[in-house]
Amino acid sequence: MNDILKYLLRSHILLAIYSFFFLYGLYFEYPSSWVYALMISFGIIGIYNLHRLWKFKMGRLPNSINDWTVLNKKSIYVLALIPTLMAMLLYFWLYSFDQLQNILTVFCVLTSVFYVKRIGKFALREIPYLKVFFVIAIWYLLFFIYPYWIFDSPQPWILGFLFLMSILIPSDIKDIYFDPHEMRTIPQVVGIEKSVKLIQLVL
């Protein structure tokens, strides 16, 4: 794989770019939608790289990702800290005036922290059968519920859920050889072939 493309993928910059254009494409008719999309993109880069650093510290990365992290640790620290701070500043400046929204934001933050940090035996991502649903819950809030509040935008609620499921199950397929079997992710339970058929059915 090209080194630049590998870096963009593994640092989650590419995911953040795609998320920016997806969000902006959904809500472009609202004047501040690009700012919201930018905030979410900063958050994606920051949180995912904080996850990477935590799992690196705990020795829970696959060997190939661990070796890549060793080589790029300084830049990953930058990507973990600066975008997270930028996302926080944008949120408190523009979007922190609704109490229920703030409560759900705290839920998102705590879920993101304990998604990788273990309490006792499990982190949230390691609870059997639930990994993909924690991720769907966060992305659903960010991509559909918050924009509904902020922009008063009508939402395709069911289609939005099905869309997120169809793009997040492949992440579990990618991790099937790294996730402990006890996690019981969808591909582990039904197999890769049936997982692909489920995605096709949803789409």
PLM region spans:
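Solvent-exposed interhelical
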Residues: 44-83, 165-202
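Functional transmembrane core segments of multi-pass inner-membrane proteins
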Residues: 132-176
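Short, Lys/Arg-rich, polar N-terminal cytosolic tail immediately upstream
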Residues: 1-7, 119-122
